[in-house]
Amino acid sequence: MRLGFIGTGKIASSVITGICNSKISFQKILISRRNKNIARNLEKKFKKVYIAKSNQEIVDKCNWIFLAVTPKIGKQILPKLKFSSNQKVISFIATINLAQLKKTLGKKVKIIRAIPLPPI
């Protein structure tokens, strides 16, 4: 299992740390360089975490993709990315609903919404 994180803020950092400290089996985690300091720290801290060159590289190389960006950034970057039907996408983006995600990512992509409270 290859995991990818688009966005490297508090939510992504917490989830990545939790996964790396758990017994979940995975090959590697690719992360975006959205927040360069957090990305570098995660890459140094965990041996299976790598910084991707682009968001599309994350989509191309991972079968589970976590969307951890603000709604504004999500609306800017998601339409440019090419997902495949065998991927699973977990969205932490509070104000982009399931119908909007399906329209943007493609109807065959499996999408799970996981909204943190309070939404940020």
Please report, for each region that a protein language model flagged, where it lies by residue:
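Rossmann-like NAD(P)(H) cofactor-binding subdomain of soluble oxidoreductases
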Residues: I38, F46, N55-D60, W64-I120
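NAD(P)+-binding Rossmann beta1-loop-alpha1 motif at the extreme N-terminus of oxidoreductases
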Residues: M1-K53, E57
